[in-house]
UniProtKB/Swiss-Prot annotation:
Top-level EC class: hydrolase
Domain of life where this protein originates: Bacteria
Protein name: Probable 2-phosphosulfolactate phosphatase
One Gene Ontology term of the molecular function aspect: 2-phosphosulfolactate phosphatase activity
Cofactor(s) listed: Mg(2+)
Keywords: Hydrolase, Magnesium
Homology family: Belongs to the ComB family.
Entry keyword annotation includes Hydrolase: yes
Enzyme Commission no: 3.1.3.71
A Pfam family this chain is assigned to: 2-ph_phosp
Classification lineage: Bacteria, Bacillati, Actinomycetota, Actinomycetes, Kitasatosporales
Length: 237
């Protein structure tokens, strides 16, 4: 487990990988910068009403089969039954007005499902960092668990984003350039740029590092038997 930090205002922050989540925290911020929650934010910006976070590819396909109007997306190359891939560059031109998206990714959706019993689950990346921090400042929880989804909690881009949001949530100034620089030099960014992964657009890394591109936060909560992500409007101070 990565070390916890208590800031001078009293917010206790814990940074963990998915395997270390354990008992459901009261408040969880699930971070996946490259690319699940950057993609989710873009989906909402393109008009999606909600995103169902699927636990497996089979579940995603079953949800799509149950309602063919749903838009199913996944990591990697496009495969039968899916409509889109987990790429902000490829998704940013999609018309998702009023649609329900079903998302299954390697890390982000897994992390959100791991904390589904938390009283508040925020899903985040740099594109919604300040909005996420404002929700935390408004709620002023005593304890916040940041789930660093990539590389079992060691992904530089996710940890940088989590620590940035934690500082902003505590009301501290933060050198955004330093945090973004760490993310830009991460293994995930390198693999995306070098074409190691499939289902990638050349602009993906740049889009994932657009700080505060969107004014909303993203809140996941159980609805019936599903974990559903929705945008949450956050008034600017």
């Amino acid at each position: 487990m990565l070390p916890g930090v208590r800031d001078h205002d009293g917010m206790d922050t814990r940074f963990v990988g998915i395997p270390e989540v354990g008992e459901a925290p009261a408040v969880a911020v699930v971070v996946d910068v490259m690319r699940a929650f950057t993609v989710a934010a873009w989906a909402f910006a393109r008009g999606a009403e909600k995103i169902v976070l699927a636990g497996s590819l089979d579940e995603a396909l079953a949800l799509k089969e149950r309602d063919p109007a749903r838009v199913a997306l996944k990591d990697g190359p496009l495969t039968p039954g899916f409509d889109l891939v987990n790429s902000p560059g490829l998704l940013r031109s999609a018309d998702l007005a009023g649609r329900t998206v079903v998302q299954k990714t390697t890390a982000g959706t897994v992390g959100a499902l791991a904390v589904r019993d938390a009283s508040l689950v925020l899903c985040a990346g740099f594109v919604v960092a300040e909005a996420t921090a404002r929700v935390l400042r408004a709620r002023a929880p005593e304890h916040v668990t940041f789930v660093v989804t990539g590389e079992d909690g060691r992904a530089d881009e996710d940890l940088a984003c989590a620590r940035y949001i934690a500082r902003r949530a505590a009301g501290h100034d933060a050198d955004a350039a330093g945090f973004l620089g760490r993310a830009a030099e991460s293994r995930a960014a390198t693999e995306l740029v070098q074409g190691v992964r499939q289902g990638v657009h050349p602009d993906d890394v740049a889009l994932c590092l657009e700080l505060d591109r969107f004014p909303f936060a993203m809140v996941a909560a159980p609805e019936d038997s599903l974990m559903v992500l929705r945008p949450c409007a956050v008034p600017r101070p």
